[in-house]
Amino acid sequence: MVVVAGLAAFGGGTLRDILLDRRPFFWVEHAVWLWLLLALCIVAMLFLRARHFAPTERAMQWPDALGLGLFTATGTQIAIGAEMPAIVAVLMGMVTAVFGGVLRDIVCNEIPRAFRDHQPYAICAFAGAWVVVVAKALDAPQWLALLAAAGTATLLRVLAIQLSWTLPAWRPGAQEEM
């Protein structure tokens, strides 16, 4: 459980740090995140065992939506702080937010959720990341940029869940039918 949670929590940020050539990795420099992950895993295991509680996939989408927003905002801000061009900062925000979950699903032998259900996920991160970039261009305070970006990505994801939004699915051979 700790390994899978660690991949989900740190995978996207680690890839971002590799791509930005940032050392040490954020979770090495700030080991408190490792301790927090371990503590949360212990609490989750105790809670699940004591209560015989099995959270549904739908229930787990809410904290995931919040994480998507927070990781998008911070990942984009880190790339901006590294003086990356706007489009690179946006992509780094998306990588930070999405790649950990992709790693988690692959390790669990599942098709990554970000790719399988056609609900907006990465595109929510894309929109939130642009909020950070635009706020920076407008000289908005950093805290406001992060809050607005996290709120945008989270809200879009929550709306996608609640309203069952889907993106068009590519169908092999669809062009041949035309």
Describe each PLM feature range.
Residues 1-87, 109, 113-178:
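Alpha-helical transmembrane segments and their membrane-interface boundaries
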Residues 96:
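Histidine/lysine/aspartate-rich catalytic loop segments that bind and position anionic ligands
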Residues 99-111:
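Membrane-helix boundary/interface segments in integral membrane proteins
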